[in-house]
Amino acid sequence: MCVAPTPSHLVWVDCEMTGLNPERDELLEVAVIVTDKDLLPLDEGVNVVVSPSSEALGAMDNYVARMHRVSGLLDELSNGVPVSEAQAMVKEYITKHIKTGGIMSGNSIATDRLFITRYMPDVHAILHYRMIDVSSIKELAVRWAPEIYSGAPNKKGGHRAMADVLESIAELAYYREHFLTGTA
């Protein structure tokens, strides 16, 4: 069986949402950075605050509303752009580096992918079906190498998309150096 090679660049994504259900919750913020295979960012990335519907904002539970209030994100929503404009900005950024087949990467990335699929289908269409989920590597380290897990960088992003993307890249770099060191 011949399998086409995947691009070496990684598309790091983090989304902040009104909740975790893409059928009723909406995007509030999306950040993307493309890195090379060595996890070096190609540039500063793109960060977009999205203007959600009043219904989605009103339906946020207290925990999520408090989280976004503390992070300062709620205060920025009045300057947010429609999701269609956010999608165009994110797609333009990604395709500047990768035309198609980018490997979506991040922490607990499956949830982000559900929201990208629902609200940014043009972005989803240019991503590969494979993903790199740093949280899966973290879970392996917890079980197989707790001493390495205990040295992992602490997260401080405070539920802001760009800070979370940068922390995910740093976390994978740590695990690559300390955990994924086997030789063939």
From Swiss-Prot:
Boundaries of every Exonuclease domain copy: 10-172
Q: What is its EC number?
A: 3.1.15.-
Coiled-coil residue windows: none
Q: Which CDD domains match?
A: Orn
- Which keywords belong to this entry? Cytoplasm, Exonuclease, Hydrolase, Nuclease
Among the GO molecular function terms of this UniProt record, one is: 3'-5'-RNA exonuclease activity
> Which SUPFAM superfamilies does this one have?
Ribonuclease H-like
User: Which PANTHER family does the UniProt record give?
Assistant: OLIGORIBONUCLEASE, MITOCHONDRIAL
HAMAP family, from UniProt?
Oligoribonuclease
Q: What does this protein do?
A: 3'-to-5' exoribonuclease specific for small oligoribonucleotides.
Output this protein's name. Answer: Oligoribonuclease
To which species is this protein native? Answer: Tropheryma whipplei (strain TW08/27) (Whipple's bacillus)
Q: Which gene encodes it?
A: orn
